[in-house]
Amino acid sequence: LTPAQQYGLGLRAGLALRQLHALPAFADAKPWEARFNAKMDAKIRAYRDCPIRFRGGERLVEYIQDHRTLLRGRPQGFQHGDYHCGNMTLTQDLRLGVVDFNRMDSGDPWEEFNRIVWCAAASPAFAAGRVDGYFDGPVPEAFFPLLLLYIASNQLSSIVWAIPFGEGEVQTMLRQAEQLNAAYEGFTRTVPLWYEQGRRLAGCEGGTGN
């Protein structure tokens, strides 16, 4: 597939996610700010107790501590729970499908982008299309700083999660940590390089958004 085709599939994946998020949160969903702050606290403790560290880990902890206020007032809706290209299907005529709903939950819709790093590793154009397709217009200014908060939280727990599955999974997560560090240039920026690269490869003009 050409980068433009990959971007087009990303647009469809973003639209599908937006449609999922139009569904209401579960009635028993607890307040998001308190719930996710508790989750981040647990992940920071687990990372610091883990014998395996990765480059940039403490920068992620600092970013989390400095940006907790971004959670304030965030809405909640239905979540797929594991939305990335590994849980999508593609037919020969390029029809996109979404599978693996066994982790469905309620939460901030934008948290669903926390696994977009898998998409970016496979295709920057697809990942950029996912973002643009979700918003169908200019990307809100608040999105990328909050995206980094959610990605940082997810990455911190990745090594701890991988250890029981063996050395191969640990190495995969360490490589992902390196890719993350590169995408954010040592966490000195909030818009990841893959977003700009993906749009450029797909022939999109301008900076962020359509």
Briefly describe each language-model feature range.
Residues 60-62:
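Short proline/glycine- and basic residue-enriched helix-capping loop/turn segments at helix->loop/beta transitions
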Residues 22-26, 69, 76, 139, ...:
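Generic structural signal for secondary-structure transition and capping sites
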Residues 1-55, 74-76, 105-106:
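A cross-family kinase active-site recognition segment
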Residues 13, 17-20, 40, 83, ...:
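Generic structural signal for small/hydrophobic residues in well-ordered secondary structure
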Residues 7, 11, 72, 115-210:
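Helix-rich C-terminal or lid/interface subdomains of diverse kinases
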Residues 64-113, 207-210:
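Active-site acidic catalytic loop and adjacent metal/ATP-binding pocket
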